[in-house]
Amino acid sequence: MEDIIKTLPQHTCSFLKQRFTLYKYQDVWNHQEFLEGRMLSEQTFKAHPNDVFLASYPKSGTTWLKALAFAIITREKFDDSTSPLLTTMPHDCIPLLEKDLEKIQENQRNSLYTPISTHFHYKSLPESARTSNCKIVYIYRNMKDVIVSYYHFLRQIVKLSVEEAPFEEAVDEFCQGISSCGPYWEHILGYWKASLEKPEIFLFLKYEDMKKDPVPSVKKLADFIGHPFTPKEEEAGVIENIIKLCSFEKLSSLEVNKSGMHRPEEAHSIENRLYFRKGKDGDWKNYFTDEMIEKIDKLIDEKLGATGLVLK
C-alpha cells in the first residue's frame, strides 16, 4: 500500500509551511492515513443494508452530527445525565470508516449496526456501500465557513500561529481543489447526484438551518435512521434535552473535550479541543476580503449552482 502511495501525485500545503502532505488518488486529495483507510476499505469492507452512513466534507458539522446521532440511538439506555457523551468525545462514539474498519466489522458480526461516519467522496465509498441501499445522511455547510474551520484545524495540528499560516494561501489552495478530501465541490456533487437517483436513501442536512432551528432537523434525523421520537417523548422534551446535550456550549465545556486526546494511542493523535473552535455560522466574515468573497461566490455558482444547495 505504501509503495502505491509513493507513486501518486502529491502536494505539500504552502500555508502550512510544508508540514502537511496530500496525495491524489482517483482524482481525490487525501492525507496518507485516510488514503490507506480508503484502500483497505475498498478491499475488505462489505456493507450491510442496515448500515447508516453519516457522510460529510471535513469541518462541515461532523462532530455535531455524530453527537446527535449517538444520543438519538442510545436514548433508551442513557439520558442527558448518564450519556457516554459526557465522558467520551463524539468521534470516539461513532466509528470512522477511514480509521475504524476493524471496529465496524466487529460490530457487523455482532449485529450492532451503529452509524458509520465517513469523509469519503461518494464514488470512493466501497462498492457494497453504494449498491446495498444503505441509508446516507449528508451534512453540508457554507463553503466559506468550511474553509475557515479547515484552516484553523490544520494549522493548530501542525502547531502554526495565524501569523505563520497565511489564510489567503489556504483559500487559494482550496479554490484549486487541493484540500483534504478535495475538491470540495466534487464531494458535494457526488452525494447530490446519487440522491437524485435514490432519494429514499438520502437525507441532506444543512448546518445553518440546524443552528437556526435544530428541532425539525433532529426529528428528521431520528425518523430517517429508524429511531423516531414518540409523541410521549416529544411532550416530555426529549428532543430538546438531546439538542442541549449535543450543543457546542455543552460539549465544549466538558473536561474530556477540553483536555483529552483523540486516538491517544496513535503517533498523530489530536487534542479533542481542536474539534470545538466556535461552533457557529458566519465566522467567515471575520476573515474574507471582498476579493476572496467574489472568488468563492463565483466558484460556487460555477461548480454547484445546479444543485440548488445554498452554500454561500
Swiss-Prot record:
EC class (word): transferase
Subcellular location: Cytoplasm
Gene Ontology molecular functions: sulfotransferase activity
A Pfam family of this chain: Sulfotransfer_1
Active site per the UniProt annotation: H119
UniProt entry tagged with the keyword Transferase: yes
EC number: 2.8.2.-
Keyword annotations: Cytoplasm, Transferase
Similarity comment text for this entry: Belongs to the sulfotransferase 1 family.
Protein name listed in UniProt: Flavonol 3-sulfotransferase
Organism, as annotated: Flaveria bidentis
